[in-house]
A protein has these predicted regions:
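Extracellular interaction modules
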Residues: 1-3
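N-terminal hydrophobic/helix-forming segments and targeting peptides
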Residues: 5-363
């Protein structure tokens, strides 16, 4: 069997990650991913809850007063079937921020109640020369039939569609998959939860795989409003500056393999950022910094405003080729994020007083 992580990640956890990556979780259709989380986390958590909107929350210490919420979004970008033409081709709209030019000629998976139906997005030599650029409305999905009647027996309008690209290893400890944004984040918060539990974390921990981040960010708002945490740790991916088309001047120099990324944004708590850096220094994890002039465009933006306001910190995983058929990440960054967040969790006392949280920041 393939071995992904060469050092501290156990084989059972690698299987967990691969099953997460294999699940289809187009925004609004996250059930496959929820089932994977429940399978692996129910034996380890005090409680596992799935709310009406679909957020799946693993709880450690539900009766403890001081609560830390960790979130990462389970949903992914994709397409939705709208109608079928007379030739049996599926017409679609986007669900989330897809890159249209990456779809033509690719194999896709259409999810139905009877199981997946496979097809290909029609393409031809001059398709990419279309005036004004490609749009989702230009897509026609060929599922191998030649009439509307045949297609409608297999697929109904509203069916979610994803690119049929899976996990594989690259060189140098890197790996590729569809939907590392943000299935990697989900994996990280669950692994940090397990490490913190083993180390005797004294506060209440709520590790939430949220829904809808790619479309509405409603899942994060629901979870934050229900848990009412004292603070929140959001884990998502971020662009690296070390690949084509990216510029370090836009938000900072971020490299694959360079370690977890902390965000300097108006919605991120300065104090929590500093605490994260102190934790990183204690355990020898190198961190990187990115800057945002306003919002972070992650679940942190919704959580920050929930209730009476929730102090929030954003920890990001460097990622190349975000929202493309094959996104690339580095195992060292994943391990660094897990270690950093676990250290952060166990550094808090049961009441939050260990670090003096809640006192005015003197800086």
């Amino acid at each position: 069997r393939r071995v992904l992580f060469r050092s501290r990640i156990e084989m059972t956890d690698e299987v967990f990650l691969e099953e997460l990556l294999g699940a289809v979780t187009v925004s609004g259709y996250e059930e496959e991913g929820q089932a994977v989380i429940r399978k692996y986390m129910e034996p380890l958590a005090d409680e596992v809850r799935t709310d009406d909107i679909g957020d799946t929350v693993c709880v450690l210490g539900p009766d403890r007063d001081f609560r830390i919420l960790m979130t990462a979004h389970l949903d992914e970008i994709g397409l939705m079937v709208t109608t079928v033409n007379e030739r049996g081709r599926l017409q679609v709209i986007d669900r989330g921020g897809i890159v249209p030019a990456t779809y033509p000629g690719h194999r896709v998976k259409v999810m139905t109640e009877r199981g997946p139906v496979y097809g290909v997005v029609e393409s031809y030599r001059d398709f990419f020369k279309k005036e004004g650029g490609l749009k989702t409305s230009d897509f026609l999905i060929d599922i191998g039939v030649d009439s509307k009647e045949e297609a409608c027996e297999l697929v109904e309008p509203g069916a979610p569609v994803v690119l049929d690209t899976g996990f594989c290893k690259a060189a140098g400890g890197r790996f590729l998959s569809r939907a590392l944004d943000d299935r990697l984040g989900v994996f990280i918060i669950m692994e940090a939860f397990k490490k913190a539990r083993k180390r005797g974390c004294a506060c209440g921990v709520y590790s939430a795989a949220t829904v809808g981040e790619e479309t509405t960010k409603n899942g994060a708002y629901w979870t934050a409003s229900r848990v009412k945490p004292d603070l929140a740790v959001v884990v998502d991916v971020t662009y690296t500056s070390d690949c084509i088309g990216m510029n370090a001047a836009d938000s900072g120099e971020v490299t694959l393999g360079g370690g977890p990324v902390l965000c300097n944004s108006p919605i991120v708590s300065k104090r929590l950022n500093r605490m994260m850096r102190e934790c990183a220094s204690r355990i020898g994890v190198k961190v990187q910094t990115e800057a945002a002039s306003r919002l972070s465009y992650t679940d942190a933006d919704k959580i920050h405003f929930a209730g009476e306001g929730i102090p929030t910190v954003l920890v990001s995983i460097p990622l190349r080729y975000m929202h493309h058929p094959a996104e690339m990440a580095d195992e060292k960054d994943v391990e660094g994020c897990i270690d950093l967040i676990a250290e952060f969790l166990v550094s808090w006392g049961i009441s939050g007083r260990k670090t003096g949280f809640g006192e005015p920041d003197k800086e």
